[in-house]
Amino acid sequence: MHHDHLISTIKKRRETLNINQEALAELANIGLRTLKQIESGRGNPTINTLQKLADVLGMELKLEVIKK
């Protein structure tokens, strides 16, 4: 599932950069609880929240809409 891959990518990048959840939440200006929910797969992040995380982690968020 794409959602699982996205969450896994964010978490792995955070860990690669040796940033703990508290620091990432603060740097991205999102709640720690929100970040924990996202990383555990229980959250439903907005595109804005994902963009904030991507910016802090030095990643690019790319949204692609395709016809099935």
Mark where each language-model region is.
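Recognition helix of helix-turn-helix/homeodomain-like DNA-binding domains
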Residues: 29-43
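Alpha-helical residues within the helix-turn-helix
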Residues: 15, 26, 55
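DNA major-groove recognition helix of helix-turn-helix/homeodomain DNA-binding modules
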Residues: 48-62
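Conserved hydrophobic/aromatic packing and binding residues within compact polymer-binding modules
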Residues: 10, 24-25, 35-38
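Short basic helix-loop element that most often maps to the first helix and adjoining turn
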Residues: 8-23
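A detector for short, charged/polar N-terminal pre-domain segments
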Residues: 1-5
